[in-house]
Amino acid sequence: MKRRHLLAAGIGALAAPAVARANAKFPDRTLRLVVPFPAGGATDVVGRMFADKLTQQLGQTVFVDNKSGAAGSIGAMEVKNAKPDGYTLLVATSSTHAINPTAYVNPPYDAVRNFTPISSVCVNPLVLYANPAMPDTMMGLIGLMKKYPGKYSYGSAGIGSIIHLAAEYLKRSVGGMDVVHVPYKGGAPAIQDTIAGNIAWSMETFSTTLPLHRAGKLRILAFCHSGRAAIAPEIPTMIEAGVPGYEAYTFSLILGPAGMPQDVIDVLDKASRQAMADPNTIKFLEGNASIPTPDTTPERTAQFIKDELAKWAPIIRDANVRIA
């Protein structure tokens, strides 16, 4: 009897390291990438592309799970509350990790402390577009707005949207403009009313505005990034157009829940770097008017979030954006 106990104990001792090794092998099953917005949108498109790239690098399926609502907060909360084992990740955006934490009266999460940064995929700069009857340069448009205070209006995708805040940021950057804000339920109605001449201008991404610009239905005056867009190099940056230092964009980051093990972070970091080193990834992102961020690291991603929070917080407060 004693011999059997000793034998069992010996087998257990031998088996324990094997189990530990098996548990340490990450990943050994399917991963979930939460996209906090509906299927078919810009964030979803980037998320699905990156999920495919991670699948190739990790040797395990990474599937996209759309959890939309509350300007991305529902999806962010889904990941915040997930087990920190690396199998549930988030495509974080400007809404979830630059705007909501300040705009919400009672934010449901801390954008820094409740998440583990993995990688940055891209930024998607906005453009400023106007009705074709408006001046054809940024300085001309700004001059007109200042000459006739309160006469003209701009549209946004809603109060607290990146478009609203980017416009408020522009007003600050040019020393103030008295222009009326017209919030819409999404960017598409603002585009239609700009074309119709009901509002003077708005901001959006290239993907929805460039075809209309080239068709002459609206005019893109500036690209809101430090460098010109590869798909439309003829359009000046906002800085070139006369607004020093101005950049406004959405972004796509890969984050996990807080408390992830370092070895799991390292695996995901390596896979993300390899995915971003793929020329097809760069081609895909640039084709969608995004700016790839291939030199990212978890540390740089963490700093990027802090910088974006610091940039937008005073603009949100000055615009008196408070979401209950």
Give residue ranges: language-model regions.
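N-terminal (or domain-start) structured segment
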Residues: 22-112, 151, 175-200, 295, ...
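An extracytoplasmic/periplasmic, membrane-proximal ligand-sensing/linker region
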Residues: 28-30, 263-324
